[in-house]
């Protein structure tokens, strides 16, 4: 079996109600025609998705999107795509969903099309983050940062991207006043969260804000491991769970009870029961919950992949 291509992409481009309805109607048919699985979010501000399938099928769906969308030349309004590979399906189905935002911050005034940080290419990232006058911020959630991040970066310890604005005001602003860094450099998985996070910070007086073009995935694809400042694995939102520096599936798996990533040592813990409980959630669920999780896991185990 040929390897499957995985493509993560987004574009901030205005979509009216008719355009959104057409996409939501057409995308499932395009996916089925091209043997593509995955998830695409559609909102008034654009599209955001990850899909997987045969290389030709993935490219055909992406090309259909390029034709359907009014894309521009700026980074945020192009169809920004990060590609990797998998030996087996990384999604169970295809879904196209209508959302209020393609990445949810919950601040209606934030608009990357009007105000966004300065993009930094992967080849220039090391020099930027090595500069002691740069404050490096990981905009991802705590369960993502727990398994890998850039050396020396600040972890906001958020549980949701919605928490970022409150963290910026409560923690980052006092830190900026105390340390007075010359600039902020931020990063996320594929770049989309930094579009909004940098827009928020620049619009609210946090000074010069830069962000990694194409995110961690782009950096790992372009920078040799021996030169890399990345440590650990990169969490991804599909069945691979995490990628190593070669953009191949790493050593982490997912607890299907609580949804958190598990290291080999986590899985070796005596409390771990696949699909039922892990060290992160052993005290979180009831016996009836665990019985339900066990039944679900048994169904997964019996389903052909």
Swiss-Prot record:
GO molecular function, one term: oxidoreductase activity, acting on paired donors, with incorporation or reduction of molecular oxygen
Family matches, as Pfam families: Rhodanese, UPF0176_N
InterPro entries: Rhodanese-like_dom, Rhodanese-like_dom_sf, TrhO, TRHO_N
Every Rhodanese domain range: 130-228
EC number: 1.14.-.-
Catalytic activity field: uridine(34) in tRNA + AH2 + O2 = 5-hydroxyuridine(34) in tRNA + A + H2O
Gene Ontology terms describing biological process: tRNA modification
Active site: 188 (cysteine persulfide intermediate)
UniProt keyword list: Oxidoreductase, tRNA processing
Top EC class for this record: oxidoreductase
Family: Belongs to the TrhO family.
Summary of the function given for this chain in its UniProt record: Catalyzes oxygen-dependent 5-hydroxyuridine (ho5U) modification at position 34 in tRNAs.
Entries under NCBIfam families matching the protein: PRK00142.1-4
Protein name: tRNA uridine(34) hydroxylase
